[in-house]
Structures are given as structure tokens and as C-alpha cells.
């Protein structure tokens, strides 16, 4: 059994940053050359990248487009992109520019037909972002919390043909508290869609804890701060993830 490790590049003002609990005022800058960071992840063996336009998530439109395009050109593997993609034009634009999969978060809650239509016409290319605070779906760059439960959101797209669900425990994101394996696996077992774990990965132990659940529907795991802070070695994480 194996899972995918997605090293994360979060963009704010063209820089590589990590936030604590999705708070834009608690951003740590890790570099000002996103394309170079993408190359370094590729050299360590990464086949996928998880890229988020943080400014875009709050603005509802692409803000760090130049940096994203530079990453796509620099990274030889596959890129999944989220942040501010809320209409079909945005989806089509990024796929045409070389993004492999597009993550729809806020729009999945507000405009589910967009997700259904795109997933039907673009099989394997649409990921639904399930960002959770205390079991409820958070939207608009995690600044707002809805009354929709995470399993309710998953159920809405059970037969839509989306590639996967990206489950982020917002309360752990960027805090190195450890991945919420229990909640992630519970969602994967409930849903008929593969699940990517995100939020709180602190060490190789978090990767190892998820690998046995590949059979439950865990497709992969996203890691950011642990890599940037040197707590997690990407090459080792990739090796462990291969089972």
C-alpha cells in the first residue's frame, strides 16, 4: 500500500509562506522564489506539488498567477492548485496552463453545480476542498464557518466524479500538532471518494500512520511547515509513503 506525498507551496504576495490556522496575519515567509522551491522538491523526488494562492483564496480570483505559472514551468511533475478558483473560466484557464488538478473549496459549497459539471466533463481533474473547523466546513480562505458538516459536503458529491476530497483540519494547519488521522480516516471510510489528508503534519510518524489506511481510501498527504522547518525530510517521507 502506498500514498502520495504532496509538498506544499503556499503563495502570499509572490512569496512562499506558511500560515498558522489559516490566519493571514500569522504568515511565516520561507522564500521569495517559488519556482526554485518547486525545483528543490522535484530534486528530492516529489512527483506531485500542492500549490495554494492564499491571496486568491481571500480575493476570490487569481492573485499570484505569475508565481503559479513559474512553478508549473519549473516542476516536471504534476501540480494541483487551489485558492480563488470559483468559476469555470478559472478552472479551464489553469488546466490549459498545465495544472493537473484544480481544487474547489468555497465554490463547492456555494455553487455545487459548478463542481458537478466540471467533474463530469473533466474526469480526474477536480478536487473538492473540505476545510473543517470543529467538524463544519470553513470557506473564504477559512475566514468563515458554515453550518454544513464535512460528511454532508462529501455526500453532495458522492456520485459527481470528483478525483478526490482534500480534507484539511484548519485548527491544526501550520501548527505541527500532528495530522488528525482519526477524522481523516473516518471521512475516507464514509465517502466513496479518495481523501487527501492535510493540516498538522509534524513528523515522519504522521506519514507512517496514514499509509496503512490507503485501503480505506486515503490517497495522500500534504505537508508544508514540517518540510520548511526541517522536521521532515521529503526524500524519507516519500520512501515511507511508498509502503
Swiss-Prot record:
A biological process term (GO) from this entry: L-tryptophan biosynthetic process
PANTHER family the record matches: 1-(5-PHOSPHORIBOSYL)-5-[(5-PHOSPHORIBOSYLAMINO)METHYLIDENEAMINO] IMIDAZOLE-4-CARBOXAMIDE ISOMERASE (PTHR43090:SF2)
Substrates-to-products reaction catalysed: 1-(5-phospho-beta-D-ribosyl)-5-[(5-phospho-beta-D-ribosylamino)methylideneamino]imidazole-4-carboxamide = 5-[(5-phospho-1-deoxy-D-ribulos-1-ylimino)methylamino]-1-(5-phospho-beta-D-ribosyl)imidazole-4-carboxamide
GO MF annotation list: 1-(5-phosphoribosyl)-5-[(5-phosphoribosylamino)methylideneamino]imidazole-4-carboxamide isomerase activity
Pathway: Amino-acid biosynthesis; L-histidine biosynthesis; L-histidine from 5-phospho-alpha-D-ribose 1-diphosphate: step 4/9
Annotated keywords: Amino-acid biosynthesis, Cytoplasm, Histidine biosynthesis, Isomerase
Upper classification of the organism: Bacteria, Pseudomonadati, Pseudomonadota, Alphaproteobacteria, Sphingomonadales
Species: Rhizorhabdus wittichii (strain DSM 6014 / CCUG 31198 / JCM 15750 / NBRC 105917 / EY 4224 / RW1)
Protein name in the entry: 1-(5-phosphoribosyl)-5-[(5-phosphoribosylamino)methylideneamino] imidazole-4-carboxamide isomerase
Catalytic activity, EC: 5.3.1.16
A cellular component annotation (GO) from this entry: cytoplasm
InterPro entries membership: Aldolase_TIM, His_biosynth, HisA_bact_arch, Isoase_HisA-like, Isoase_HisA-like_bact, RibuloseP-bd_barrel
Pfam families in alphabetical order: His_biosynth
Subcellular location(s) of the protein: Cytoplasm
Chief location bin: cytoplasm
Amino acid at each position: 500500500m502506498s500514498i502520495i506525498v504532496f509538498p506544499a507551496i503556499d503563495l502570499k504576495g509572490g512569496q512562499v509562506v506558511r500560515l498558522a490556522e489559516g490566519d493571514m496575519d500569522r504568515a511565516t515567509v520561507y522564500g521569495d522564489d517559488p519556482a526554485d522551491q518547486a525545483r528543490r522538491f522535484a530534486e528530492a523526488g516529489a512527483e506531485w506539488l500542492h500549490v495554494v494562492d492564499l491571496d486568491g483564496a481571500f480575493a476570490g480570483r487569481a492573485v499570484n498567477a505569475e508565481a503559479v505559472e513559474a512553478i508549473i514551468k519549473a516542476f516536471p511533475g504534476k501540480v494541483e492548485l487551489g485558492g480563488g478558483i470559483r468559476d469555470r473560466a478559472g478552472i479551464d484557464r489553469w488546466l490549459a496552463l498545465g495544472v493537473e488538478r484544480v481544487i474547489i473549496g468555497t465554490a463547492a459549497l456555494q455553487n455545487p453545480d459548478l463542481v458537478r459539471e466540471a467533474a463530469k466533463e473533466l474526469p480526474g481533474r477536480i478536487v473538492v476542498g473540505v476545510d473543517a473547523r470543529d467538524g463544519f466546513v470553513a470557506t473564504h480562505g477559512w475566514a468563515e464557518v458554515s453550518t454544513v458538516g464535512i460528511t454532508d459536503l462529501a455526500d453532495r458529491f458522492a456520485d459527481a466524479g470528483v478525483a478526490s476530497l482534500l480534507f484539511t483540519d484548519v485548527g491544526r494547519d501550520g501548527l505541527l500538532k500532528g495530522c488528525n488521522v482519526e477524522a481523516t480516516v473516518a471521512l475516507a471510510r464514509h465517502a466513496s471518494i479518495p481523501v487527501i489528508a492535510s493540516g498538522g503534519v509534524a513528523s515522519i510518524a504522521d506519514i507512517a500512520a496514514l499509509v496503512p489506511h490507503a485501503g480505506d481510501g486515503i490517497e495522500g498527504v500534504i505537508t508544508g511547515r514540517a518540510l520548511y522547518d526541517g522536521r521532515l525530510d521529503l526524500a524519507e517521507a516519500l520512501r515511507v509513503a511508498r509502503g
